[in-house]
From Swiss-Prot:
Residue span(s) of domain LRRCT: 137-175
Keyword Repeat found: yes
Pfam families per the UniProt record, alphabetical: LRR_9 (PF14580)
Gene Ontology cellular component terms for the protein in this record: axoneme
Location within or outside the cell: Cytoplasm
Protein name according to UniProt: Leucine-rich repeat-containing protein 51
Tagged with keyword Repeat: yes
Ranges for the LRR repeats: 50-71, 80-101, 103-124
SUPFAM superfamilies cross-referenced by the UniProt entry: L domain-like
Organism: Bos taurus
Amino acid sequence: MNKRNYMNTSVQEPPLDYSFRSIHVTQDLLSEEPRTGLRPVRHAKSGKSMTQSLWLNNNVLTDLRDFNHAVSQLLEHPENLAWIDLSFNDLTSIDPVLTTFFNLSVLYLHGNSIQRLGEVNKLAALPRLRSLTLHGNPIEEEKGYRQYVLCTLPHITTFDFSGVTKADRTTAEVWKRMNIKPKKVRIKHNAL
């Protein structure tokens, strides 16, 4: 990416806000008007939004099919997307498409229907992820939920709207040593 096309993600623009729009599929974003806030979202000459935040909370999304396509149609610089709010939808898994946004630092997934704790592993591919929410999903009931997430994502500083402390990290490491067994390597012997 050249410097001319790079947007400073430290400058916080208002979000592109599609919350409370009864959106069922991501393609609906292209025909739906975003909510207006106190400050208007800036647009490029192309008509696309210049924001780094996309809010899709409180809708009825069950998957993120065509998410990349919709985002590329809405944002001038989709590669700079830093905040995605998908809270209070009906997502049952963490779609790998989210891992394509390498600048993602805030991801809200609370209040969905994510059932497998192993889904969190996908988010380890996001090097800048610092804030994550998953509470209100069935995985929250899993034994060791917080420790598992903190072990899997050691760079996050806020989890479920609570700061991650040194004590949390220590507890997570102890939990990991007690609960996550290293995979045994099987050696195959060729029969002669």
